[in-house]
């Protein structure tokens, strides 16, 4: 999938997003003031933690941890690792958006003192496929695949954002 196909897959309407973007962030002090589509990624602090924030349209707002987990882990351990940090695994759609904006995300991760997303590994998503399988995202080409939850893969937690006026 290319960037446009992924944005369409996750239901992102660029024209509509441009129209509602100002409204979306009107009451959110932390929100960046980008002009879509090029500046949807920013560095923010939430709960004393520096994150790379991604804002796409009116549906996807999340912060990416600056670092991967120290080791690859199975899906259950990956979920627990993220939860112990007060975060979660990204959804499949969020992972695909991370692929779409990986250059911008990696630049901000580096600027914030974090580690770039690896292109040579698969990352766990929170999206389950079955009782024994979950979805993964590969950041070199945006591949979304399925594998056993018992296998070890890379983990990059994310946090949800809410605007408080």
Which residues does each predicted region cover?
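An exposed tryptophan-centered "aromatic clamp" motif
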Residues: 75-88, 92-151, 158-161, 165
């Amino acid at each position: 999938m290319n960037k446009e196909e992924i944005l369409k897959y996750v239901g992102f309407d660029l024209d509509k997003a441009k129209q509602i973007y100002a409204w979306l962030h009107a009451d959110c002090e932390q929100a960046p003031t980008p002009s879509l589509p090029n500046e949807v990624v920013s560095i923010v602090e939430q709960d004393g933690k520096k994150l790379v924030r991604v804002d796409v349209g009116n549906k996807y707002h999340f912060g990416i941890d600056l670092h991967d987990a120290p080791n690859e882990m199975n899906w259950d351990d990956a979920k627990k690792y993220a939860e112990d940090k007060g975060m979660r695994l990204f959804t499949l759609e969020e992972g695909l958006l991370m692929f779409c904006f990986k250059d911008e995300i990696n630049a901000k991760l580096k600027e914030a003192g974090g580690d770039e997303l690896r292109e040579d590994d698969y990352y766990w998503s929170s999206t389950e496929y079955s009782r024994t399988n979950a979805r993964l995202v590969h950041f070199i080409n945006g591949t979304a695949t399925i594998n056993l939850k018992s296998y070890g893969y890379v983990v990059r937690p994310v946090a949800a954002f809410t605007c408080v006026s």
